[in-house]
Amino acid sequence: MPVTDRSVPSLLQERADQQPDSTAYTYIDYGSDPKGFADSLTWSQVYSRACIIAEELKLCGLPGDRVAVLAPQGLEYVLAFLGALQAGFIAVPLSTPQYGIHDDRVSAVLQDSKPVAILTTSSVVGDVTKYAASHDGQPAPVVVEVDLLDLDSPRQMPAFSRQHTGAAYLQYTSGSTRTPAGVIVSHTNVIANVTQSMYGYFGDPAKIPTGTVVSWLPLYHDMGLILGICAPLVARRRAMLMSPMSFLRRPARWMQLLATSGRCFSAAPNFAFELAVRRTSDQDMAGLDLRDVVGIVSGSERIHVATVRRFIERFAPYNLSPTAIRPSYGLAEATLYVAAPEAGAAPKTVRFDYEQLTAGQARPCGTDGSVGTELISYGSPDPSSVRIVNPETMVENPPGVVGEIWVHGDHVTMGYWQKPKQTAQVFDAKLVDPAPAAPEGPWLRTGDLGVISDGELFIMGRIKDLLIVDGRNHYPDDIEATIQEITGGRAAAIAVPDDITEQLVAIIEFKRRGSTAEEVMLKLRSVKREVTSAISKSHSLRVADLVLVSPGSIPITTSGKIRRSACVERYRSDGFKRLDVAV
């Protein structure tokens, strides 16, 4: 599909010209009203207010300078982000600092990006201002409270260049396996990736349904930013937004919003589907119907097959179609979207021989009773944009052989901010002896392990997280899925080296149950036996140590991904407070 040199500001002006009175973004605030207070902006309002913010930013710096957005979830966040782009600045979307403690991640990102301004709101300006420090001799960033600007006064719109085809924003990675780095996302990347995802999710563009985007995802994360702000703009859709906290407090709100938004599309990580199943009652769904939900993307973290099944079964009585669930693979370095099953297909799984998988071969299980690992299909990706490559030789792997997923195309971003060496290593890979139809390069090395089997993409996990025990490869996501089917909570499977080899250690979050200390210990012993047996049976592995900890003990990133390297460090320093010390 062709990608033009259009920019996000040019699209925003086009929406304001062509659909001035159409609702663009609606934010539902459950904090001020448990039933939800809705506040909306039309496309003309979004455009005029973004221009006013851009005019204010012109006083702070020049196009190409960075502007950090540290605001609560809401319409002000949308306006701040689009205002930064309208001025030709490079936006840096971030979360507001954690209250009461120093937010090291916010400090590190601000030091790395060196913004000339910080866009925030009056409700959090006191916390945000503490981070507006000078770095490397540069002036401290100007703090602008977006909600205190006169955004409604009629005025002549300032003239801005609409041809900002370079960097649009820096998407700082969550850092599950390394220090966070700023991914440079261009205007072309955004438009190309949203367009690509629309083709992937709906097939024929002429058949793309009109409708509403529904999202509670944080606007500072790649999936939340693209889904909540960029996709509605590029695809001419209305957005219905709420805060992550509103979802976490009452997951049923997500399902209720999906049921009352007409034809709608949404997305969430795997854990959200699990929460919706467990914490949405029949009373919550009384009188509601999900037949108009055209798609719910499951992405951002490993998709558990059992969770998908539970979600479909739970909401089938409310007419949710199985074809609405869209397993998707992507990453910030490719803007967001890379692959998904074809439109109209229900989620498909294949059970692979586990012993063969540990040897790097994907062989579907037969009827011989071999132990299998069930993986979900991410569809048949375009061979010109996705290849499976041997990470050591840089030679493309044949079908059925596990390797690193490489990605090519207009959606691949510009690299890492101020990290030329890392950019060259990750973004400038070239295939050795490429097939006639394969581009030699540049290819993005995703760091993810996958395989093409029967033309479809299956994903195992991160290369850096791979567990090598007794000379065989084991995938921590698979082991964690086995544990979670028993315990229901978060689990981390890590490899801890001893004098000879690596040993499997499982860290499991578990809520203590029992009225007496004896009952608690009996339950913990039972869980340990059940988990140890399940891992041995499903993965042919011996657990060297199984650590039961309280919920919230496992280190995670801001997007909820397990920081396995931090788990290893904490375990080796005896930093986990074990529930099972007497077990």
Curated annotation (Swiss-Prot):
Catalyzes the activation of long-chain fatty acids as acyl-adenylates (acyl-AMP), which are then transferred to the multifunctional polyketide synthase PpsA for further chain extension. Catalyzes the adenylation of the long-chain fatty acids eicosanoate (C20) or docosanoate (C22), and potentially the very-long-chain fatty acid lignocerate (C24). Involved in the biosynthesis of phthiocerol dimycocerosate (DIM A) and phthiodiolone dimycocerosate (DIM B). PANTHER family: DISCO-INTERACTING PROTEIN 2, DISCO-INTERACTING PROTEIN 2 DIP2 -RELATED. It comes from the Bacteria. It comes from Mycobacterium tuberculosis (strain ATCC 25618 / H37Rv). Its EC number is 6.2.1.59. This is Long-chain-fatty-acid--AMP ligase FadD26. GO terms for cellular component: cytosol; plasma membrane. It holds the Pfam family AMP-dom_DIP2-like. Vaccination with the fadD26 mutant protects against progressive tuberculosis more efficiently than does Bacille Calmette-Guerin (BCG). It suggests that inactivation of DIM synthesis can increase the immunogenicity of live vaccines, and increase their ability to protect against tuberculosis, indicating that fadD26 mutant could be a potential vaccine candidate. A double unmarked sigE fadD26 mutant is more attenuated and more protective than BCG and is also a promising new prime TB vaccine candidate. Belongs to the ATP-dependent AMP-binding enzyme family.
